[in-house]
Amino acid sequence: MEINWSWQRFNDISGEAMHEMLALRQEVFVVEQGCLYLDADGLDKQSWHLFGRTNDQQLVAYARLNFPNTRYPEPSFGRVLTSKAIRGMGAGRKIVAACIQKSLREYPNLDLQISAQAHLTEFYAEFGFTKVGDPYDDHGIEHISMIFRVPPNG
């Protein structure tokens, strides 16, 4: 299945695309994972949004890249998700790679910090992320902070 990727800032997202984004985030994080939290947390306005759509424009993958000094001093990405329809097809790897590339392009001298679900630390380590600190509970799911260090020469 071919997925077409595009980045948008909050103010450039149409009402329909915003609805699709929020619905898919709720489907994955609230319904599937049982995390009861305010998804529209105010960080969307200070973020780049990655949309992954099929050729028929169905939203099947998503992530957001928070601007520096929004969640952490460094840029960070989160809300990484794929719909059930495409899981196991490598889209998660493409999302993480796209987030790293976008961060390096927009913020070339800044490291990238994430709050990773603990069971995904090895997955993120494959991209160069290292654990920082101890695991912690985030809405009933164990997480750990991880950081991607930008090489000294960018």
UniProtKB/Swiss-Prot annotation:
Sample GO molecular function, one term: acyltransferase activity, transferring groups other than amino-acyl groups
Residue span(s) of domain N-acetyltransferase: 8-151
SUPFAM superfamilies listed in its UniProt record: Acyl-CoA N-acyltransferases (Nat)
Protein family per UniProt: Belongs to the UPF0039 (ElaA) family.
Name this polypeptide is given: UPF0039 protein sll0451
Organism: Synechocystis sp. (strain ATCC 27184 / PCC 6803 / Kazusa)
